[in-house]
Amino acid sequence: MLKFIKSIFKTPSDRIIANLKSKIQQVHSAESSLAKLSNIELRNKTNEFKARLANNEPIDNIQYEAFAVVREAAKRTIGIQHYDEQLIGGILLHQGKVIEMSTGEGKTLVATLPSYLNALIGKGVHVVTVNDYLAQRDSDWMGTIHRFLDITVGCITSNTNEHARKIAYNSDITYITNNELGFDFLRDNMQFTNQSKVQRGCNYAIIDEIDSILIDEARTPLIISGPVSDNTSLYPIINKLITKLNKDDYEMDEKLRNVTLTDSGINKLETMLAEINILAPNSNSLYDFENMHLIHYINQSLKAHTLFRRNVDYLVKNGKVIIIDEFTGRTMDSRRYSEGLHQALEAKEKVEIQNENQTLASITFQNYFRMYTKLSGMTGTAMTEATELKEIYDLDVVTVPTHNPVQRIDYNDEIYSTKKDKYSAIIQLIQECYSKGQPVLVGTVSIEKSEELSKLLHSKKIPHNVLNAKHHDKEASIIAQAGRIKAITIATNMAGRGTDIMLGGNAEMLVDQSNLTEEEYQEKLKITKMQIEQEKEQVINAGGLFVIGTERHESRRIDNQLRGRCGRQGDPGQTKFFLSLEDDLMRIFASDRVTKILRTIGLKDGEAIHHPLINRSLATAQQKIEAQNYEIRKNLLKYDNVMNDQRKVIYEQRNEAISSDNVNEILHNLTEELIVETVHKFIPPKSYKEDWNIHELLKEYHHIFNVKLQPASIEATSSSSEVIEYLTKTALDIYKQQEQDYSAKSANEAIKHIFIKTLDQTWKEHLYTLDHLKQGISLRAYGQKDPLNEYKREAFDLFKQMLLHLKYLFIQRVARLHIDLASSPKSTSSLLETSDNNLKGKIITENSMAHKYFGKISRNQLCPCNSGKKFKHCHGALK
């Protein structure tokens, strides 16, 4: 019935595809004449296209001809020709859409079409992948086509040095991971010269596995941080106390991933803290003001012990706690949990505790990728997230039909009462498949589960491979051979995604080329391919690849991705999920009513059940979790949008200063603004002269400009505007004197450097303040206030304060500028290094100036600059 209804009422994707099929003929028509061209003549088509675009011909006018050129080049270079469905995918990508193409349908090849076409403009194309292996593989493989057509290709991985990065970004097409792309953007906005930057803007990006990058990773912002000198000695002490608590001492909510102490837990901790003299003197309550800082350590340690599991949420490797990505199952070596949670985990695992970090720069993938002029992407599973992709990124999703009909069989779920029964059934099915030579891919949700299943297979003496975050270096080679006869592969979540599982195996990966001549390699490859073809027939006869899911994921999309690992390009395949009432999804999210019904039915040991009610309950649970995660991502975006608007202002000012040959305009404008604000503070406009606070005005002016003026000079004026004019002229005279002392060029370079350093310092402090504001803002809801509106309002006020503080510090530093030109024969620009250590002796640092001009001040006193901050966090900050 459903198929009949679908045949009558076409989906939006069906209508779009039907419209594009007629346009594919234009590609075929253009291609007929290209086959006769020599390689050089075909390559020259690139120059022809560039010339036509330079003459303002619309890019869409050359689209089909350009696609035909790429198709012909692919046939001549890698021996593969785009089929019609891939051409349709290429058109949709060029239109800035997300295409859903099944596994094995050649998404990598599809991307060559729009990437070539858009590279002709000369502004760069970024082909974004999820890991270094895929970026390098696609660059080498697909780059052959582009280089043949005289299009430059670059590749950036985590090991690429700065010089090579710049060359790669300046290439026509750059293959790169999403993390490298985002971090390079942040790093570029921390550089001191345009020459030090590596990127050249955001023109057009094609994102492979777009759902993984824009949906799964959207909750985790990219952060560049630096260590702060917080004391970490409390973490192991608190950790030891937390281990002495029992389950009655805290309440845990696994749905919300939250844990709180009960009264008994608080009482126990207060007693233990008092015994080891951690509580403040004359205090016996954890919630006394003097002890409030301990709550942070306790909460994080409690989370570490109750909500975070080793080999599920993180693993310990080489004495370090490394986060495991919950969606990909891969390790995130360069990332750390914030707010002391990572330190709590390090204390729990008894490894070296590293200092907490302070954010220096951050951005979410949501805001980063929205900077691109044009954005498109491809994946095997996007329709379940079509609403989010449209609402947040304004991207439409279109399903591209498969080249061959799908022959995969998806069996109903089997549900068992216990995990033990479930694993027994899985092992039995694996044994059956193994005995007839059918390859099996088993998907697990964590390292812990994959190793548990591996032990069971070892006990049955069934040979197998395990692919998880501990063995990620072998990922591509293991997954590529998962389609061989009797191959049993256990993989976490999305491990190996992006690498096709070929029935019979992958010949190129089986033949080691390192010790062979080209002739020997080709001969061995030919023999291996023949063997694989024979093996493929045996695998097909056995039923193709059998994919087993050991439990349902929180997201339906992840389940669909696992199913999609088999049945590529019309190959046969089978999938089945095995569940138990002890699975996290069933235990935490499935309704109590369903569990009660199953208990009432009374499942016997080893007995499975197929029940529509349970399937509906699971689907409902998954939809609820997906909706909850979507709300989290939307909420994160709302908060990040506040910071993003401020980030744009700061980065714009920074780039303007870096690009400027003369920063005098910035200096003079800020000086005039500050003097107006300062004068109006002590001499309000239209006020009587006897109300003027001349003494405090001159005291403030001295703090800023290091110039002592006599009261008579102000008393001689008749209005606040005259005072402003006089004080502004005095300040500008200081700057003129600096130009005479050091030359205009030297002074300009020094002032530019001071502005950028001061901007970076105040922005870093502002990010720190915003982090703390965000942590506690949700509590405003208890006061009947909208936390988001409160955050927007306070963040804006803080931003205004930051800009005022920036102005004050910058002008104060410039007024005290001293360049020691005699210390080195180098140019002034070479004297102005980015590090504070190199800065000392060249430009007087803020810390030394603060003590010189403010006198002896306690570090905990308010700073005399009127910023409202403590002296130690302002002019007395340690450099």
UniProtKB/Swiss-Prot annotation:
GO terms for biological process: intracellular protein transmembrane transport; protein import; protein targeting; protein transport by the Sec complex. GO terms for molecular function: ATP binding; metal ion binding; protein-exporting ATPase activity. ATP binds at Q86, G104, E105, G106, K107, T108, D500. It is an enzyme of class 7 (translocase). It comes from the Bacteria. Its main location: membrane. It is a peripheral membrane protein. It is found in: Cell inner membrane; Cytoplasm. SMART domains: SecA_DEAD, SecA_PP_bind. May bind 1 zinc ion per subunit. Its cofactor is Zn(2+). Keywords: ATP-binding, Cell inner membrane, Cell membrane, Cytoplasm, Membrane, Metal-binding, Nucleotide-binding, Protein transport, Translocase, Translocation, Transport, Zinc. Pfam families: P-loop_SecA (PF21090), SEC-C (PF02810), SecA_DEAD (PF07517), SecA_PP_bind (PF01043), SecA_SW (PF07516). GO terms for cellular component: cell envelope Sec protein transport complex; cytosol; plasma membrane. It catalyses: ATP + H2O + cellular proteinSide 1 = ADP + phosphate + cellular proteinSide 2. Zn(2+) binds at C863, C865, C874, H875. Monomer and homodimer. Part of the essential Sec protein translocation apparatus which comprises SecA, SecYEG and auxiliary proteins SecDF-YajC and YidC. PANTHER family: CHLOROPLAST PROTEIN-TRANSPORTING ATPASE, SECA INNER MEMBRANE COMPONENT OF SEC PROTEIN SECRETION SYSTEM. Belongs to the SecA family. HAMAP family: SecA. This is Protein translocase subunit SecA. It comes from Orientia tsutsugamushi (strain Ikeda).
